[in-house]
Amino acid sequence: MGRSAFGSRTRMTAFVDLAARLAAEPADAALKDVVLTIAETCAQISRVVASGALSGSLGAAGSTNVQDEEQKKLDVITNDMLSDALKACGPVAGLASEELEEVEPTGRVGGYLVTFDPLDGSSNIDVNVSVGTIFSVLPAPAGHAPTEGDFLQPGRNQVAAGYAVYGPQTMLVVTLSGGVNGFTLSADGRWLLTHPDLAIKPDTAEFAINMSNQRHWAPAVRRYIDGCLQGKDGARGKNFNMRWVASMVADVHRIMMRGGVFMYPWDAREPDKPGKLRLMYEANPMSLLAERAGGKSIEGLNEILDINPAKLHQRVPVVLGSANEVEVIRAEMRAG
């Protein structure tokens, strides 16, 4: 063992790598191949993100995506990286990206379908704030090439889900067979298990929400946040802290590490839209991770994982995190 620049001993050999950890999972070998392909691509994306302006990859791409949002150059680059890798992965029958209007069959039948947000929080990339990649894996139909309808499965059908967060460290958080595990990308490009069996604390005094939208919220959301802001002098009897990064990956990762609730509710700015976040690319995979880590995830009254999708780019409101606090919010929603 050597010493780092700070004098502490390095013990990289003490950590289990992703391939070895997946080998211990009871999941299908083909599914493990899909997860490894995504993980390897996320490691490559991490290097591209880290190079920033040095590679000329910052700034706008001069185009919009299917959501009519301005694309960053890295949105396009990372989407192409994941799309190319998954098309070359044998068990993948089809893929769908937040950045693309239609699903992309690979020409194969059976195996798995993958949905992904290639660079969540990309509006932060030019100011060097954490961004990430979110992915979901679903079973593919056995008898035909997949169509859009085959992707429209409830979140409980997911066979794997995860995200990579590109921050001070690059981490991969993933679930396959039941538990949730966190891996850190080493300097030599290996995913090493540093956070086994992640669990979200059931109680919290921390919430994540965009307070600038307060005047547009439904009464139940305003009541809940007002109660938090009253602190120990109010009915809740304790002080709360607020955190908001405007990158779902970063905000949810903090909750996975230390508890809290993430809220992106419906608001009156666009009353005909049920929410901002995409069910298939963001809400479903994050909800599976949250539930398997002991947390909860609801759209207001009901569990997000029970939603039957109506369309590929469907949006939903999201309340996710510490189980007991999510129930407090659900009770406010029931009160109207």
Swiss-Prot record:
One of its GO terms (cellular component) is cytosol. Mg(2+) 1 binds at E98, D117, L119. Keywords: Carbohydrate metabolism, Cytoplasm, Hydrolase, Magnesium, Metal-binding. It comes from the Bacteria. Mg(2+) 2 binds at D117, D120, E282. Pfam families: FBPase, FBPase_C. It is found in: Cytoplasm. InterPro entries: FBPase_C_dom (IPR044015), FBPase_class-1 (IPR000146), FBPase_N (IPR033391), FBPtase (IPR028343). One of its GO terms (molecular function) is fructose 1,6-bisphosphate 1-phosphatase activity. Pathway: Carbohydrate biosynthesis; gluconeogenesis. Substrate binds at D120, G121, S122, S123, N210, K276. Its EC number is 3.1.3.11. It catalyses: beta-D-fructose 1,6-bisphosphate + H2O = beta-D-fructose 6-phosphate + phosphate. One of its GO terms (biological process) is sucrose biosynthetic process. Gene3D superfamilies: 3.40.190.80, Fructose-1,6-Bisphosphatase, subunit A, domain 1 (3.30.540.10). Binds 2 magnesium ions per subunit. Its cofactor is Mg(2+). Belongs to the FBPase class 1 family. HAMAP family: FBPase_class1. Homotetramer. This is Fructose-1,6-bisphosphatase class 1. It comes from Caulobacter vibrioides (strain ATCC 19089 / CIP 103742 / CB 15) (Caulobacter crescentus). The gene is fbp.
